[in-house]
Amino acid sequence: MENKIFSGDSFFTAAGNVDTMSTEPLSVVFLGGSLTSGDIDYEGTSLTDWNMKWPNTVLRFLNGLFPSREITAHNAGLGGTGSQYGAMRFAKDVLAYSPDLIFIEFSVNDMPNIHHERSVNREGCLWRQKFLENIIRQAMNCEKVPAIVYVHLPVPALIGSERNLAHRLSCEFKEDMLRYYDIGTIDVYDVILNEFECRKKMDSSLTLQEFLKQYYHMYDSGVFDVHPHAWGYKLFNLAVVNALMKEPQKYLRPFKMRKDIYCKGEDEIVNRTFNYIKCGDERIKYTGDWKIYTAENKLVTDNSFLAIPDGKYTNNNDFPDGIAQVYMPKDEASFEFDTEADAVCFPHVSSKLGLGSTIYADGEKVGEFTCFSNYQGMNYSGDEIKLPKGKKHVKVKINNPTETATVFRYGYVVEIFDK
């Protein structure tokens, strides 16, 4: 503990004032899902306006707060990232940048299934809580311990609705643990409600639904898309920056280095570690018509989701280390590797037809997953595949039982080591 450096100590003087004279470089990382990356609005299109992304607005604020510090920022937002995948990504996509300050946003993607009973939702929240604590413990183990700010971005829903209750439950479970570590939190949902109350004073007939429609797209079903209009993103920006501006000491400071974990009896998950195997790593052997695409050899696709030599759309922006793709007329393909991991995960896979994959360890079936076929091709259901103890040979077999030719893609294998 004596040898650790706490980045949060560098933000203020001994008198408690913002240290505007410090010239120390400042590294800031933002970790979250699509609302952090700013990749899409409600229509699924790219947010091209730099000012719309809340991390960029925060960065602009920090540059004003610390005018003498050279600030570098990395946006590690990636669509669909919640606490589980965030824990897997933390070392590779956050700690690799030696951050002094980290902003985390998972509350939307961590929202439990609204169709489950509340008791089941509680179990889901507890499960995600363990991975968020894993992230905090990873940060604690750094020689330079970063400051952390947690941001609750909202799910637009009517108060008391199933969707609203599920989201608030997710936030409540996080708040309990974040208080244990004395990590500051910013709740944008509260800001939205305050804005609604202010508007209602001017127009007593205004309903919450009509108010939300000014910021979000509402479908015919009455459900709002979680990706807002441009004005919704601006509301995020104002909420986060105003909180930081009002009480910087509340957020820009070290968190408590707790010896005991919060999630009692869950040491296996809270203290686990992760390793990424890139799809182009020599450890992985392929069977089938596979190709590896990198930043220099980009995967370009058309709307048919099949790879073409030239085109307008690129799908590997999220995979700077490469994408492996196999063209499958109707037969099977596979990739295999040796590992001593306790489990493996394939967090981002895609196929146009929703192909099924079966995982074997030393010839015995240990799990399977189905690839979703949305535009980013993400798979988060049944992520972790438990493996036998010790060294084993893992084979992933992809099946195409249809008569239609298609492709399968993936970016990484994540090795999971329990402690």
What do the predicted segments below correspond to?
Residues E2-S7, Q209-K419:
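Conserved catalytic region of serine esterases and O-acyltransferases that act on ester linkages
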Residues E2-A76, A91-S98, A343-H348, K352, ...:
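Serine-esterase "nucleophile elbow" of acetyl-processing enzymes
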Residues K4-T13, A147-H152, R168-Y219, K234-P248:
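Extracellular serine-dependent O-acyl
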Residues F11-N17, N56, Q84-A96, V120-E123, ...:
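Alpha-helical scaffolding within the catalytic cores
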Residues N109, I136-E172:
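Active-site segments of SGNH/GDSL-like serine hydrolases
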Residues G79, E117-W127, I159-L165:
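The substrate-binding groove and active-site-proximal loops of carbohydrate-active enzymes
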